[in-house]
Amino acid sequence: MATLQEKLITPIAAESTTPNNKITVVGVGQVGMACAISILGKGLCDELALVDVWEDKLKGEMMDLQHGSLVLQTHKIVADKDYAVTANSKIVVVTAGVRQQEGESRLNLVQRNVNVFKFIIPQIMKYSPNCTILVVSNPVDILTYVTWKLSGLPKHRVIGSGCNLDSARFRHLMAEKLGIHPTSCHGWILGEHGDSSVAVWSGVNVAGVSLQELNPAMGTDRDSENWKEVHKLVVDSAYEVIKLKGYTNWAIGFSVADLIESMLKNLCRVHPVSTMVKGMYGIENEVFLSLPCVLSASGLTSVINQKLKDEEVAQLKKSADTLWGIQKDLKDL
C-alpha cells in the first residue's frame, strides 16, 4: 500500500545527495553558535553541520536551530560527535579549544590546544579533503599555523580570522569619533590578533583623504587629539566585553560570516586575515599574521603589498618574533 508521501509526490529524477555549499562549525560554545547564527542569517549555506564532544548541548543547539528553519534559507541543519556528519564541507570553521587557566603560560595553553587540534584536524581532512579551513580559536595566529601543519593543506586554504574583527572595531571607533558611518572610514589593523597588533595610521583615510596628512602626529605620543587611544581601545575592547558579559561572541560571529561570504560568493574582497607571511616585510620564519588578503572561491588567493612606514614594518617583525618564540617550542607537529 502506498504511503502518504508516495501518494503526494511523484519522483521525476534522483535528488543530488551532495551539498553545494556545506559549512561545518566545530565547537558549539558561545563563539561557535554566534558563527552558526550569522552564517544562517546571511543564507550562506545549503547545509550546516555542527560538531562537538558535548553531546546534549550539541543536540539541543541543533534542534533549536531546526525549529527556526521555516524562516531560514537553510533547512538542513545536522549535528553529531562523529565527524562523518561534516562530509563534503566547503568551509570548516574551527572555534573549539581549551581556555587558559589561571597562572598558565601561553606556551602551555597553545600546547594543550595543539593536542586538541591533533584530533580535530585529521578528522576534518578525512571527510572534507577539499575544504578550506577557517580558524577562529585563540591564539588564532599560532593555531592557524598549527592547522596548516597538521592538515597538509596548501597555505591558501588555511586562513585565520585574524585582524578582521580588530579592523572592524578600529573603523567603528574612528567613525564614531568623526561622526560618520564605519564603511566610509578606512583603516587597517595588521599583525598579530591581540596585544601586539599594528595600527596602520599611514593608510587611514576618509574618501581618499589621508588623515595623517591632515594630522601628521596621528597615532603618535605627540598627537594632541590622542588618536593613539583608538588603537588601545581596539586592543582592550575584548577584555572589556569579557569583563561585562563573560565572553565575546556576536562581533566575531558577524566577522566570520563576512569572511565566508567573500569566499562562497567569490567576491574577491580584501580582508585583514591571518596568512603565512614568511618572505614578506623581511619576516624569515613560518608564522601566520594578518595582512590585507583577497578572499575568493579558491580561498586566500592574493596578498596586497601595502606600503608601510619603517616603524610599522618593525612592529610587524616584532609580532612575528613573538609568535615564533612560542611556535618553535611546540611539540608533536
UniProtKB/Swiss-Prot annotation:
Q: Per its UniProt entry, which superkingdom is the organism in?
A: Eukaryota
- Can you say what this protein is called? L-lactate dehydrogenase B chain
What is the first-listed, main subcellular location in coarse terms?
Answer: cytoplasm
**MF term (GO), any:** L-lactate dehydrogenase activity
The record's listing under CDD domains reads: LDH_1 (cd05293)
Q: In which pathway does it act?
A: Fermentation; pyruvate fermentation to lactate; (S)-lactate from pyruvate: step 1/1
Q: Describe, as the record does, how this protein assembles with itself and its partners.
A: Homotetramer.
Q: Where does substrate bind?
A: R106, N138, R169, T248
Which purpose does this protein serve, as stated in its record?
Interconverts simultaneously and stereospecifically pyruvate and lactate with concomitant interconversion of NADH and NAD(+).
Is this entry keyworded NAD?
yes
What PROSITE patterns is this protein classified in?
L_LDH
Coiled-coil boundaries: none
> Does Oxidoreductase appear among the keywords?
yes
